[in-house]
A protein has these predicted regions:
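Glycine-rich phosphate- or other oxyanion-binding loops that anchor nucleotides, phosphorylated ligands
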Residues: 1-125
Length: 125
């Protein structure tokens, strides 16, 4: 996460995703309607951990401008692009395991996966 308001184990619904640090042809934005009562979040899909924060002031950030994105990720835009191409709706939930800049030893992946599983199970009820 890039936002100090989010903590390990929080689950959010990504409603907008932008691609960072790529040529203009690949710098796309993807938006989806809200489908849950989870907190809505925006994301930046990156190639390198920490790249979202490093590129916030660059013009290529599109809709974000200099606003701090809530979540940094590496795969979200790829899934969104495939779904757009196939004209298929999708929902993107993301569990927070760490803040950008945290050492890998500080990441709480197991806690995030557990929280995501609980959120998905609650939606099934």
């Amino acid at each position: 996460a890039c936002d100090a308001k989010l903590h390990a184990g929080d689950v959010v619904e990504i409603v907008e995703d932008s691609v960072a640090a790529l040529p203009a042809a690949y710098r796309l934005s993807y938006r989806t309607p809200r489908r849950t009562l989870l907190p809505a979040a925006r994301a930046v899909t990156v190639n390198v951990v920490g790249e979202a924060v490093a590129s916030l002031s660059e013009p290529q950030m599109g809709n974000y401008g200099t606003a701090l994105p809530v979540v940094e990720q590496m795969e979200g835009a790829a899934v969104a692009a495939v779904c757009r191409e196939l004209e298929t709706e999708y929902m993107h939930l993301r569990a927070i395991s760490n803040h950008v800049g945290d050492k890998r030893s500080e990441w709480r992946v197991a806690e995030a996966v557990e929280a995501l599983g609980a959120a998905a199970a609650a939606m099934d009820e």
